[in-house]
């Protein structure tokens, strides 16, 4: 299984901390960037072939990780035009002819530690086209929202600064 990591966002909500000189996934936790921790979790789960979709400040990510060999990974990059971002799903369009098998898709600024093999087993057992892992949060007004019923996604609402609840 391969992994695709979306790392092209501007990180506007955290720009006071990043100073718009490093992308949000490069913020450090315990001495390493969030993105490093994600990649090491993928490696722990046997996933070493990773495509990173970069955009705003993507050069910082490329300079740090390179081709991934020093981390025991095989990293490739797809560059999204930072002036014309396509959004989370839109950026996957770049990969429509490149990845034909199941893959894990992660947002680069989310710090998670899950068993991807179990998630893939669930995906296959349910004959799913897409398996989506979500979590509740305390700030729905500035987050993407997924409306589900009985384990089936019914709607997706992109974050909007106009939403108050």
Briefly describe each language-model feature range.
Residues 2-5, 32-111, 116-118:
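Conserved N-terminal catalytic core of the sugar/cofactor nucleotidyltransferase
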Residues 1-20, 43:
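N-terminal nucleotide-binding beta1-loop-alpha1 segment
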Residues 20-36:
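Short catalytic helix/loop segments, enriched in acidic residues and glycine
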């Amino acid at each position: 299984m391969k992994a695709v990591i979306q790392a092209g966002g501007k990180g506007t909500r955290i720009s006071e901390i990043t100073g718009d000189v490093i992308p949000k996934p490069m913020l450090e936790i315990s001495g390493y960037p969030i993105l490093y921790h994600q990649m090491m979790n993928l490696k722990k789960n046997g996933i070493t072939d990773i495509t990173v979709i970069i955009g705003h400040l993507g050069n910082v990510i490329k300079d740090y990780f390179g081709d991934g060999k020093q981390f025991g990974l095989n990293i490739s990059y797809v560059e999204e035009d930072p002036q014309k971002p396509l959004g989370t799903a839109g950026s996957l369009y770049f990969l429509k002819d490149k990845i034909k098998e199941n893959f894990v898709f992660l947002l680069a600024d989310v710090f998670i530690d899950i068993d991807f093999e179990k998630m893939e087993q669930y995906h296959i057992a349910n004959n799913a086209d897409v398996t989506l892992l979500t979590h509740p949060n305390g700030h729905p007004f500035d987050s993407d929202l997924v409306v589900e019923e009985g384990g089936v996604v019914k709607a997706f609402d992109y974050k909007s600064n106009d939403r108050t609840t």
